[in-house]
Amino acid sequence: MQLKDFNYHLPPELIAQEPAHRRESARLMTLDRKSGEIGEGVVADIAEYFVAGDLLVINDTKVIPARLLGRKETGGKAEVFLVRRRDEAGQVWQCLIKCSKSPAPGSLILLSEGVTARIVERSEHDTWIVSFSPEEGFLDRLEMIGSMPLPPYIHRPANVIDGERYQTVFARERGAVAAPTAGLHFTESLLQKIRARGVDILPLTLHVGLGTFMPVRVKDLSEHRMHREYYRIPETTAKAVTDRKKAGKRVIALGTTTTRALEHAAAEDGSLDAKEGEADIFIVPGYAFKTVDALITNFHLPESTLLMLVSAFAGRDRLFNAYAEAVRRKFRFFSYGDAMFIY
């Protein structure tokens, strides 16, 4: 399978630069993956697509203000972008570093609020291992010195509104450097409407990491190596998934990140145990899904691994037909864009 098989034309004006006026006011495209039938509505009415006995699994990761501005000891400007936590305390991180010259191990970058970043060593994917000091309370200081890591296709600086809207209402566990964007559409009242239909809503955690920003660099997808992302599935969620699969009920994943965690952790029969690990699963067409029966997701970038995952779930031709229709109907794309419900 070739990278070019996942390209499509997207007019730049359809890339959402701002969130919808209200979370649940985003448009919703529905796609029946068996018939290919396409429908249209709004996210506010998504509860209508749930039935009693369904399980909705959400990702409760919380985006950290991962973009840090500072200066090198020589006075030159430097930008540090947190990618992945490398220790339990949250002091050591894998980072992208942008400055005039490549940093040297042992050198310092001076940030605000008395925080310093010491370059430890070079790591994978053009990143560096960086140790931050003071050692205690670094994650708390991030709220003061960092800014929201908006994706590069949003052509404006992060603002106060992004601090709220580039975060799900159920975000709990700090560690993501990008939002699980399908969840951005949901409000507490909408979740309550879904529960009222006899649906359980349970969390897992997957910290969205470096791969969100990394393009696929190979033409032949069999040569691609997926990035790793930390995840944790609690006992209550694992048991609920297992019970639904045994009973023939639906497991609905809110987002591709939730899907990756579930599919990485699941046994062949779809059952789950509580688990903590790193997901590096690369899902492309031909993959047999073990747990997920329906998927809520946004519209994804051409040639991205997320688009490949959704193509595997919906069928490539059906999905690309839906994307062409979304372009024709002027849906909004990517992180702050509209949503799909694929069943």
Swiss-Prot record:
Keywords: Cytoplasm, Queuosine biosynthesis, S-adenosyl-L-methionine, Transferase. Signal peptide: none annotated. It catalyses: 7-aminomethyl-7-carbaguanosine(34) in tRNA + S-adenosyl-L-methionine = epoxyqueuosine(34) in tRNA + adenine + L-methionine + 2 H(+). One of its GO terms (biological process) is queuosine biosynthetic process. Gene3D superfamilies: QueA-like. Its main location: cytoplasm. It comes from the Bacteria. SUPFAM superfamilies: QueA-like. One of its GO terms (cellular component) is cytoplasm. Its EC number is 2.4.99.17. It is found in: Cytoplasm. Pathway: tRNA modification; tRNA-queuosine biosynthesis. GO terms for molecular function: S-adenosylmethionine:tRNA ribosyltransferase-isomerase activity. It holds the Pfam family Queuosine_synth. InterPro entries: QueA, QueA_dom1, QueA_dom2, QueA_sf. Belongs to the QueA family. Transfers and isomerizes the ribose moiety from AdoMet to the 7-aminomethyl group of 7-deazaguanine (preQ1-tRNA) to give epoxyqueuosine (oQ-tRNA). HAMAP family: QueA. Monomer. This is S-adenosylmethionine:tRNA ribosyltransferase-isomerase. The gene is queA.
